[in-house]
Amino acid sequence: MSNESIFEPPAWDERYSGEGKIWSGNPNAQLVAEAADLAPGTALDVGCGEGGDVIWLARRGWTVTGADFSAAGLARAARNAEEAGVAERTDWWQVDARSFDAGGRAFDLVTSQYLHPPEGGMVDVVRRLAAAVAPGGHLLVVGHAPPSGPSHDSGHHTNAQRHAMFLATDLLPGLPEDFEPLVVEQRPHPVTRNGKTMEIDDSTLLARRRP
């Protein structure tokens, strides 16, 4: 993918149309940490990819909508949900987060994991996602923080990808006034690539919409 194409649907359609899994299929760590104790309800996962988080939520009793701008990714996610036996608890929505409009729909949990629109666009995405959170519901946004040192994962991403990274505090301007931030922090965790262990910081924002 070129630096520009990584942010557009055709590049991801091509990637998801290939052989083999792109992602592990395991739920993302911060989703597990923050959603495991929430009472199941309705959830929206924006940027759902192959559906790993959707499947995890559905297995825990949630009714989940997986949203992504890649039709090929959504097709994979639907197949994975069918194989996991949770198809009846899931549905799929092709939409670009940069132009996302909830259209009056509201969810008890809205989550987005590692979605990185270019040029600081994540603040506007947070604003759009917040509009889809029901009163009393939660918004969880997780992404890559900019590398903070030589031991962090600075070489795995392109310049364009690094410029799209954010800190949790960067996202606060996107929260409407009726949201209460509960978690605003970077959470380091080790990863191993090519036999080398390094740290990645997860920028984690959890907020609750007041009833």
Regions found by a protein language model. Name each.
Residues G136-H144:
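Conserved beta-strand signature within the Rossmann-like core of class I S-adenosyl-L-methionine
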Residues G85-A97:
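Conserved SAM-binding strand-loop segment of SAM-dependent methyltransferases
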Residues D108-M122:
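A short SAM/SAH-binding and catalytic strip from SAM-dependent methyltransferases
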Residues R162-E185:
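Short alpha-helix
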Residues R98, A102-L109:
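A short acidic, Gly/Pro-enriched loop at the edge of an enzyme's catalytic core
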Residues V123-P135:
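A short glycine-rich, Lys/Arg-flanked "PGG" loop and its adjoining helix->strand segment in the class I
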Residues M1-L38, P147:
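Conserved class I S-adenosyl-L-methionine
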